[in-house]
Each structure stands twice: as structure tokens, then as C-alpha cells.
């Protein structure tokens, strides 16, 4: 295999590393720079003289790695942990049954001669994650990986990954690709970086855009993000036509070499629902030819997290129930939990049809996995079905690990997936919806980079980040206004409250429901609410008595900040509960009527995304050539009125807030907007 000069240089570094006293080698490489080629060459070399452990964070990534290198590759979990064992508690009441699946760290017989290669290393978690029902080693997979390799006894580990991709969930950085992380542990580190895009991929518009995002991540000042487009390579699709384009491609290609990538589990669920409606004409249960995304490794069936499988046939459906003790309103109660299963035929890892059970409840849920109570119900139901098996025995554990229901496939519909779920995968045609990831902060850019680089041939995009400086644009200082126009928001219709019937203004009722949601799981309660003209009096029950708060509001039920009649030690927290309105549900559906408004919308939306501010409405006013962006900032409503002249030039903006220049979040948005023009 012919290597580029840069790859050859790094290969020589690897050879020197194997024979050195260094323990960790970090190989960083961006999209299109030949990381997989390097992994194969390195694996071939190491396998000649050392024990090679080739692994990846997900099952899908491990399977791809095995196919591309010709070496056996497994998930990190399968490589470093022993066969699971169960710690079960003996109980009299079956509903009290508890268990914990434990997998201890496996130490290979090869001892210090092991060399581990971890591909897709940006996904390796380095924080402790404890779970009520599972225990994997020390619950820190990075620490356990190092224990498995035993670097202090001569073992070595090579991390290969893309530093521009998303870090593990809940971590600001990918520590597997950070030299400082290992040096702080007393380990000697060698590092190298692949930066040259291979010649055959150099003309790819997809990679050009990826490199643009990569370069932005390296800059402190970020003021331009515009995707390059080219037909059949990178194409923009309007939100209205996005789903249709995806469905047309599926119909024409007859393959499953395409996917929609979006930001949240909720958005993925909506896309999957709409796609199935378009395919089958109604919200029908799982059926033949549906696509599933495996969400949890299943070693019994050899189907791995991140793999996509077609449904070959659908068989019998059945329900299993079990009593489980759970907390309801602070009281422990026994409830019956019912889980739904369906028998399906899917391809096994060799492509041959196999029958298995699928846990159907998870398919359409917005949750990433089943709840702890549902997991307990699975276990308790097994105990009910096998009353003669004694928990803690080898026979019990063997039966549980082979039970078709306890080990049922856990999956989501696989037409649309999140940015984290798509990591480690590639598709010929990828459809990316960048909604909520259009900011210039690191998180948004890494998400955009990860989603963008999943496409091998064609990238179709919608709600794309598009940020450019506007040469004639200026922004006035923030003005304090006495009122915000009622058009600032359109609320969804809300139900009555214990203190308001349906004749009361919808916004007043929405405010109550928002406060009621905020006050849950706190030591406070709403005692009474008294309605007066443009005033809601909330009497809040605290551990020390009842406190009164006055909530004045303007036309359209635009509430000002709450005022405590008698401030005390509870006031600060209660004011936060009363003022926070993020739980309010708005009808926000804006489509720009022309290009200038579209550019403005992308700019304002990006600024709001960056600091997590909610846009509540956008209104175009043709009579004075303006567009008004309304938003919820610093506990109150604010707006930015922007004027666009007849030629489409954006001239100036007037920001206004009910609290004037004290509106910190509006000020931050103005700073972000201004930064684009410096």
C-alpha cells in the first residue's frame, strides 16, 4: 500500500514509538486525510511481533474497522471487560427484586506486550458514569482501558481520531486526543497529525466545507460561515422540500445508503414519524422493510450499537408485565409495568435472516433508552417466568443472558438520527438539518463538522448556517421601552388552571402553567393566585409560611419581573421560578419572504443559538421596510427592529427591551452580531 510522504513520516514515528519508553501515541487526522489507511498499515506492522487489540467505541465503528483493515476488531467494552455476572438481592416480594449486571476488567495473558489501537477515539468517554443497574469496571471506560493495556508494564495504546468531531456527551473535550490528559497521569506521549487531504478527495466540496469548519474551530474570532455548494456534491434544499427530496432518493435508489441527520432525539423522532407516514400512509406499527438503528450492543445476537438493519418480516406481538416498586409523588408504590415486544426477522452479522424479539416501546419514544423501572420490569418478569431458577446461581445467569425478552433488540427507527448517533458511520447521500446548530460556538461547529463529514458522495442541507458581514449595517444602543407589541409571541392554546377559567387571557393561563412546571420538585408550592387588572398576585407556600409576589403585566400578558412584597431568604429562588418562561410553548413558524430577510434571520438565529436565547416571533413590516425579531432575554421580552431599504441593503437596527440597557442577554446578542463586522 503506497503512503503519502506525510503518512510515511508518521509510520516511521509509530515504529519508533513501539520500541520506545512512551506509552501513548495520539494520531489526529481530519476527514479525508487517510486515517483508516494508516490504521491498517499500523495494525499490519504491530501484528507481526506484538499482541494486537483493535477496537472502537461503537459496534458499527468496530465492524467497519474490521472490514477495512482485515483484522479482528471489537468494541472497547467487549475487549476490556469480562463476561457479565449478576449481583441479585434475595427478596420476599418479587416487586422488590433488584439486580446489578457487573463486568470486571479483563487483563490479557499477553501482559505488557499488548498494543491497543482505538479508532474513532474522539468518542471515548473519560468521566465516571455510574448506573443503578450496571457496573463496568470502575465505571470510567478510559481508566479501565488504561488498566487493560497496563502501560506501566510495557503495554502501549494508539488513539486515532478526528479532533474536530463531537466530544463524548457531557465532556467539553475529547481527552483521548489531548496530550495533557495522559501526561498528568505520568504517561509519556508521542503525537502526530494528518493534515493533508488525499489527492483523490481534494476536489470534494464536502471536504472543503469540513476544512472550513475545522479552521474556524482553531480561531478565537469567528465571523464568517458560508458553505460552498456544487450540484451533486453539496446542495441546499428548502425546509419544505427537504423530506420530499429524501423520499424521492429512497424511491429511486432502492437502497438504504442515505440518512437524515438532525440535532435532537425529538427532531429525529418527528422525522422518522413523518417519513413512515409518507411511506405507509398512516401511523402504522413496525412493518416489513422498515429500517432500524440498533441503540445498544447485543452480543447474544451479534448486532451492535450504531448498526442499521432492515426488517425482513414482522411476526407475533405480545406483552410482558411485572410489578415494580417505584416513587410516585414521593411515595414508594408497587406498579405494574407492561412492555411490548414483537418478533422480527432481521439479518445477522453475516447477512443471513434470523428471528429475534424487539422491544417495541423504545421505537417511537423520545428517550434514548428505556427507564430504570422498565429495566427492572424486564428482570422481574424473567424471574416470574422462571420461578425455579435461583438468582445468583450460574444456571440463573446463563438463562438470563440467553433469554430472548431480556436480550431483545433495542432500536429506534433508522431513517433519521442525531449527530452523536451518526458518528463512526458513512453514507453515500446524507441529508443534514442544521436547525439549532447554526451558531459559531465550539459545540455547534463540532456538530456541523461531524454531520457534514458523514457524506461520501452528496450532502443535502437545510437550515444551513449562513453568516456574512454586512458592510452598511449599524446597531443603535439598547433603548428602554414601556411596552412590547403583543405580536411579540403567539402562544399555543393552553388549558384552564385551578385559579383561571378559559375566559382569562391565554397568556395569563400560560404564565401559571409555566410557573407550575418550574415549581415542581422544589420546597415551594402555589397557595393561591388572585387576578387583578394587569396584575397577578401569587401567594407562595414556603417552609416558613406564605409569601406574596406581585406579577404585573402589560397588554398581551407580557409579564414584568416578579416583585416580592416582603423579601426574605427564599426570594431569590422564588423570583427565578416566577420569572423563568422557557417552558412556555410558542407557535413560531417564520419563512422569510426574500433573500435579505433570510440572511438576517440566519444571523439573528445563530446569535441566539450561541447563548441559548429563544426567538418568540419574527414579523415583517412592509409599510416601513422593517423586520422585527422578538425574543425572551434576561427574564423579559425584547426585540430588535431592523430596517432594510428598497434595494435589499440592511441599514440599521434598533434594539429595545422592557429593562433597557440592563438586559444582559440582549446586550450579548448585540455583541455577537457586531463581532461579525469587525
Residue spans for each PLM region:
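C-terminal accessory regions
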Residues: 330-506, 513, 539-545, 562, ...
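Intrinsically disordered, low-complexity regulatory segments enriched in Ser/Thr/Pro
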Residues: 543-579, 628-671
Amino acid at each position: 500500500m503506497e503512503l503519502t510522504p506525510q503518512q510515511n513520516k508518521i509510520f516511521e514515528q509509530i515504529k519508533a514509538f513501539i520500541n520506545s519508553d512512551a506509552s501513548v501515541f495520539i494520531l489526529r487526522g481530519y476527514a479525508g486525510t487517510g486515517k483508516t489507511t494508516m490504521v491498517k498499515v499500523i495494525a499490519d506492522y504491530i501484528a507481526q511481533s506484538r499482541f494486537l487489540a483493535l477496537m472502537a467505541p461503537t459496534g458499527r465503528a468496530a465492524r467497519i474497522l474490521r472490514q477495512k483493515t482485515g483484522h479482528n476488531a471489537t468494541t472497547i467494552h467487549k475487549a476490556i471487560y469480562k463476561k457479565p455476572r449478576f449481583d441479585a438481592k434475595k427478596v420476599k416480594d418479587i416487586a422488590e427484586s433488584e439486580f446489578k449486571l457487573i463486568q470486571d476488567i479483563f487483563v490479557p495473558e499477553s501482559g505488557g506486550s499488548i498494543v491497543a489501537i482505538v479508532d474513532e477515539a474522539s468518542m471515548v468517554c473519560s468521566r465516571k458514569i455510574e448506573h443503578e443497574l450496571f457496573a463496568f469496571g470502575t465505571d470510567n471506560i478510559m481508566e479501565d482501558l488504561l488498566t487493560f493495556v497496563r502501560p506501566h508494564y510495557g503495554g502501549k495504546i494508539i488513539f486515532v481520531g478526528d479532533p474536530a468531531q463531537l466530544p463524548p456527551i457531557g465532556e467539553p473535550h475529547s481527552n483521548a486526543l489531548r496530550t495533557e490528559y495522559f501526561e498528568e497521569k505520568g504517561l509519556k506521549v508521542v503525537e502526530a497529525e494528518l493534515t493533508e487531504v488525499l489527492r483523490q478527495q481534494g476536489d470534494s466540496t464536502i471536504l472543503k466545507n469540513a476544512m472550513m469548519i475545522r479552521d474556524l474551530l482553531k480561531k478565537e474570532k469567528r465571523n464568517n460561515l458560508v458553505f460552498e455548494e456544487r450540484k451533486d456534491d453539496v446542495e441546499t434544499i428548502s425546509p419544505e422540500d427537504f423530506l420530499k427530496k429524501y423520499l424521492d432518493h429512497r424511491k429511486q435508489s432502492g437502497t438504504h445508503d442515505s440518512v437524515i441527520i438532525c440535532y435532537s432525539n425529538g427532531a429525529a423522532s418527528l422525522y422518522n414519524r413523518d417519513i413512515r407516514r409518507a411511506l405507509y400512509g398512516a401511523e402504522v406499527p413496525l412493518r416489513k422493510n422498515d429500517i432500524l438503528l440498533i441503540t445498544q450492543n447485543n452480543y447474544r445476537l451479534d448486532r451492535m450499537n450504531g448498526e442499521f438493519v432492515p426488517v425482513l418480516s414482522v411476526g407475533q406481538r405480545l406483552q410482558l408485565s411485572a410489578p415494580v416498586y417505584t416513587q410516585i409523588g414521593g411515595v414508594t408504590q408497587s406498579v405494574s409495568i407492561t412492555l411490548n415486544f414483537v418478533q422480527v426477522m432481521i439479518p445477522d452479522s453475516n447477512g443471513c435472516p434470523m428471528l429475534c424479539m424487539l422491544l417495541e416501546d423504545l421505537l417511537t419514544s423520545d428517550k434514548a433508552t428505556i427507564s430504570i423501572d422498565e429495566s427492572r420490569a424486564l428482570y422481574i418478569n424473567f424471574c416470574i417466568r422462571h420461578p425455579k431458577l435461583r438468582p445468583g446461581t450460574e444456571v440463573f445467569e446463563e438463562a438470563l443472558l440467553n433469554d430472548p425478552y431480556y436480550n431483545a433488540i433495542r432500536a429506534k427507527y433508522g431513517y433519521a438520527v442525531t449527530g452523536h448517533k451518526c458518528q463512526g458511520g458513512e453514507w453515500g447521500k446524507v441529508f443534514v438539518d442544521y436547525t439549532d446548530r447554526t451558531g459559531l460556538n465550539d459545540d455547534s461547529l463540532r456538530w456541523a463538522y461531524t454531520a457534514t463529514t458523514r457524506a461520501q458522495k452528496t450532502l443535502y442541507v437545510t437550515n444551513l448556517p449562513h453568516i456574512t458581514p454586512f458592510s452598511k449595517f449599524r446597531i443603535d444602543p439598547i433603548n428602554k421601552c414601556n411596552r412590547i407589541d403583543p405580536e411579540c409571541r403567539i402562544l399555543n392554546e393552553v388549558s384552564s388552571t385551578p385559579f383561571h377559567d378559559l375566559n382569562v387571557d391565554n397568556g395569563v393561563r400560560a404564565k401559571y402553567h409555566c410557573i407550575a412546571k418550574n415549581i415542581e420538585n422544589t420546597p415551594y408550592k402555589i397557595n393561591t393566585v388572585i387576578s387583578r387588572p394587569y396584575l397577578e398576585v401569587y401567594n407562595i407556600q414556603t417552609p416558613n409560611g406564605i409569601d406574596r409576589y406581585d406579577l404585573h403585566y402589560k397588554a398581551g400578558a407580557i409579564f414584568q419581573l416578579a416583585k416580592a412584597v416582603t423579601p426574605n431568604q427564599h426570594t431569590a429562588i422564588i423570583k427565578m421560578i416566577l420569572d423563568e418562561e422557557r417552558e412556555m410553548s410558542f407557535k413560531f413558524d417564520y419563512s422569510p419572504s426574500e433573500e435579505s430577510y433570510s440572511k438576517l434571520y440566519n444571523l439573528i438565529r445563530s446569535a441566539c443559538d450561541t447563548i441559548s436565547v429563544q426567538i418568540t416571533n419574527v414579523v415583517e413590516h412592509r409599510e416601513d421596510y422593517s423586520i422585527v425579531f422578538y425574543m425572551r432575554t434576561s427574564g423579559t421580552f425584547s426585540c430588535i427592529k431592523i430596517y432594510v431599504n428598497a434595494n435589499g441593503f440592511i441599514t440599521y437596527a434598533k434594539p429595545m427591551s422592557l429593562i433597557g440597557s440592563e438586559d444582559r442577554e440582549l446586550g450579548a446578542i448585540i455583541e455577537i452580531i457586531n463581532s461579525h463586522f469587525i
